[in-house]
């Protein structure tokens, strides 16, 4: 089979773009690390918890939306009953199973 030269060119351009982006991020991280020795670093450090809180809140909203969608899908396509609860295994919803007494 002959290789597609234009496909390889696209892959190479994509790789170059990814590498350039990674180098830029690395450069910014290095600058942030070097700025911790300067008095202005406290401003940058003070912002990071706010960004983390914002990301955590956004992630929680995304998970809540996923849980709601999974719960609605399960109720629509199953005769069982499900609840939303955090799971050690990353499940968004858990089935509720009734306990039957032994006869």
UniProtKB/Swiss-Prot annotation:
It holds the Pfam family SOSSC. The keyword Transmembrane helix does not apply. Signal peptide: none annotated. The keyword Mitochondrion does not apply. It comes from the Eukaryota. One of its GO terms (biological process) is DNA repair. Coiled coil: none annotated. GO terms for cellular component: nucleoplasm; nucleus; SOSS complex. It is found in: Nucleus. Keywords: DNA damage, DNA repair, Nucleus. Belongs to the multiprotein complex Integrator. Component of the SOSS complex, composed of SOSS-B (SOSS-B1/NABP2 or SOSS-B2/NABP1), SOSS-A/INTS3 and SOSS-C/INIP. PANTHER family: SOSS COMPLEX SUBUNIT C. Belongs to the SOSS-C family. Component of the SOSS complex, a multiprotein complex that functions downstream of the MRN complex to promote DNA repair and G2/M checkpoint. The SOSS complex associates with single-stranded DNA at DNA lesions and influences diverse endpoints in the cellular DNA damage response including cell-cycle checkpoint activation, recombinational repair and maintenance of genomic stability. Required for efficient homologous recombination-dependent repair of double-strand breaks (DSBs). This is SOSS complex subunit C. It comes from Gallus gallus (Chicken). The gene is INIP.
